[in-house]
Amino acid sequence: QVEDIRELIGDLTLAKLQNIFNSIIKRQENKVDPIRSKFGKIEKEEVSLEDKMSDLELYAGTHHYFSFRGLLERQPGKIQVIVTFLAILELMKTGVITIEQEHLFDDIQITSLIYEEQQADGETGSSD
């Protein structure tokens, strides 16, 4: 477990995370699907935080570095963006990933800590 939240997020502030999150949400709202926009009723989409965390852990196991913005932009809808955002926060809290931002307004880079562990396990050739 991560002892110090400041060590976890470095100079990244909640305001920076919120700005990126808000810009992604705004883009999701501005997307118009020509087929779905004509529907009278949209079905409720069930999205599980646990499932999203599992999906992200699998992704982190095969990708050492990936983009926060890119990850959110690939989500098909607003609910998916929100749940993905929450899953990222949970994975940071549990020490599966870390995040960093080089400069103000730069994209946030996510680093997978389990990718590094899996690579180290693969190099030792353990066959438990």
Residue spans for each PLM region:
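Long, charge-dense, low-complexity tracts
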Residues: Q1-D128
